[in-house]
């Protein structure tokens, strides 16, 4: 296969811009409802090979977006959410691969979601936005891949909800995906995960400022979204990391009901940051899509689902991940192997919890690099 080779640039992909693709033709959703027109925000890194064989689609988790790598301006304080993994010489090597990342439908970072204008009146969808599924997200992404002129993806890759999408790609479009990289993910949302998500949604809907989802002309339900984010953020860590990072350090009056412990201040900080960049209705819509994710229920058995796939799989599990624990990765491996599929699993020992797929770069880099190398040389 032919790939573009460029001179190395150790500083990463540099300054990038978010692009948008628009479609006037409505998307028919799993529910039978339609959504349209549709906009997808996306970014690309590297160059597409002349034979279009080197494209990799990166799929983000709940709070992610299209900005996976690089900076939007020289004054940006932080790069994209997976910058350490994408760039020249990095696992998703932009000297070799054409890397794409898009914001999911239902989101609030440039793609069509509840805060987008409704085509009938130009006002935000709000409560009128339809419920979507992980498969709906993938069907929208398929339009983007078509528009970019790509027939077959070298790989799809994602962690957490991004892993849901990667799996869905291999089932929905088996002839268009050669490899799938699954990190800290599962073939279904467990009852525990559904419970955490429900409590978060309940907090948002109990905020008087939610107003049934139609709050865009007034104050947003910041208190409810803050509680949802705090709860969710705890599930991304683990007890060992919390003890190591915060212990029982205090900064405040023991008789005050406000934040006193270091962990409380940390959660308040995370909630405030999240409120500044995320929409409460998007949180509701996306977490419900996550709850409904279940390949076994959709296809009768997990083995039957994998029987539909043609891709090679690399799955990374993380020892301290209690949101999508390693046992769920092993269940996928058993089902895939029963279906005769190539499914390689690695357990990474870490104290970073579920967030390890974002932070434990060194531990996972060579595994991903080697997997992609094999795909390119087959």
Curated annotation (Swiss-Prot):
Annotated active site: 160 (nucleophile), 321, 354
The keyword Nucleotide-binding appears for this protein: no
S-S bridge residues: none
Record key words, sorted: Acyltransferase, Amino-acid biosynthesis, Cytoplasm, Methionine biosynthesis, Transferase
Domain AB hydrolase-1: 54-359
Top enzyme category: transferase
UniProt pathway annotation: Amino-acid biosynthesis; L-methionine biosynthesis via de novo pathway; O-acetyl-L-homoserine from L-homoserine: step 1/1
One GO cellular component term noted in the UniProt record for this chain: cytoplasm
Lineage start: Bacteria, Bacillati, Chloroflexota, Chloroflexia, Chloroflexales
Main function: Transfers an acetyl group from acetyl-CoA to L-homoserine, forming acetyl-L-homoserine.
Main location class: cytoplasm
Protein family according to the UniProt entry: Belongs to the AB hydrolase superfamily. MetX family.
Domain of life: Bacteria
Gene of this entry: metXA
Catalytic reaction(s) noted: L-homoserine + acetyl-CoA = O-acetyl-L-homoserine + CoA
Designated name of the protein: Homoserine O-acetyltransferase
NCBIfam families: homoserO_Ac_trn, PRK00175.1
UniProt-listed Enzyme Commission number(s): 2.3.1.31
Compartments, record wording: Cytoplasm
Record's subunit section: Homodimer.
Taxonomic source organism: Chloroflexus aurantiacus (strain ATCC 29366 / DSM 635 / J-10-fl)
Example GO molecular function: homoserine O-acetyltransferase activity
């Amino acid at each position: 296969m032919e790939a573009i080779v460029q001179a190395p640039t150790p500083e990463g992909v540099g300054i990038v811009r978010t692009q948008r693709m628009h479609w006037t033709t409505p998307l028919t959703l799993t529910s039978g409802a339609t959504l349209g027109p549709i906009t997808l925000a996306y970014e690309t890194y590297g160059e597409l090979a002349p034979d279009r064989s080197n494209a990799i689609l990166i799929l983000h988790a709940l709070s992610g977006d299209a900005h996976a790598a690089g900076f939007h301006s020289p004054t940006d304080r932080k790069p994209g959410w997976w910058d350490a993994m994408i760039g020249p010489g990095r696992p998703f090597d932009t000297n070799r691969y054409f890397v794409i990342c898009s914001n999911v439908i239902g989101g609030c970072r440039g793609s069509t979601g509840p805060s987008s204008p409704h085509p009938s009146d130009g006002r935000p969808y709000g409560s009128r936005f339809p419920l979507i599924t992980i498969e709906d997200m993938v069907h929208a992404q398929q339009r983007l891949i078509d528009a970019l002129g790509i027939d077959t993806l070298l790989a799809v890759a994602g962690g957490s909800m991004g892993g849901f999408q990667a799996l869905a790609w291999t089932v929905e479009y088996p002839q268009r995906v050669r490899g799938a990289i699954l990190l800290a993910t599962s073939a279904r949302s467990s009852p525990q995960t559904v419970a955490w998500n429900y409590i978060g949604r309940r907090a948002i809907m109990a905020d008087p400022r939610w107003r049934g989802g139609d709050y865009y002309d007034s104050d947003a339900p910041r208190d409810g979204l803050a509680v949802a984010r705090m709860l969710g953020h705890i599930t991304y860590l683990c007890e060992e990391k919390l003890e190591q990072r915060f212990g029982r350090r205090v900064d405040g009056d023991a008789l005050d009901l406000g934040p006193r412990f270091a962990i409380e201040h940390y959660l308040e900080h995370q909630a405030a940051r999240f409120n500044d960049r995320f929409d409460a209705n998007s949180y509701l819509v996306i977490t419900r899509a996550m709850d409904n994710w279940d390949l076994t229920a959709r296809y009768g058995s997990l083995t039957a689902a994998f029987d539909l796939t043609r891709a090679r799989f690399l799955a990374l599990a993380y020892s301290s991940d209690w949101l999508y624990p390693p046992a769920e990765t092993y269940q996928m491996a058993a089902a895939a192997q029963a279906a005769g599929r190539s499914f390689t699993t690695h357990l990474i020992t870490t104290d970073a919890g579920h967030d390890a797929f974002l932070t434990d770069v060194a531990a996972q880099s060579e595994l991903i690099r080697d997997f992609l190398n094999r795909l390119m040389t087959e």
